Amino acid sequence: MWLLNDLFASTPVHSGERLSVVAMQQLGEIGARAKDLFERNRKLLNEFLDTREELEAVRPEFGTVMFPRVRSGDSEELCRVLREKYETSVVPGKFFEMPAHFRVGIAGETAVLEEGLERLGKALDEISRG
């Protein structure tokens, strides 16, 4: 009896190739969904930034990440509080030789970003209280 592994072991990317064909056939729909998602999430993050005086950011029109700066000068404490107390991850700016910044992505589902921004707000409030 043949196993799927016997059939696909010599070409392990077969399933990936099949999925890529399906995706290419629906590229317009996929692109439209992605554009809508990025625009909605970018607007959400920009609105959040408008309410947070302790952050500033260049607000690009395109892309899937933003790189806000913590005005106090160090994002390390913010990243630690987010990770330890709120189980939320952002990428510390130290990895980009910009320790006052942190990287946040907007390519995920909007509900996840909303929850993440709520947690980010709580962490910022906690840090500002001392």
Region locations from a protein language model:
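Residue-level recognition of strand-loop junctions within catalytic nucleotide-signaling folds
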Residues: 25, 71, 107-109
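Conserved glycine-rich beta-strand-loop-beta hairpin in the small C-terminal domain of fold type I
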Residues: 17, 21, 37-46, 57-69, ...
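Surface-exposed helix-capping loop/turn segments at secondary-structure junctions
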Residues: 50-58, 128-130
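Preference for bulky hydrophobic residues occupying beta-strand positions
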Residues: 49, 68, 104-106
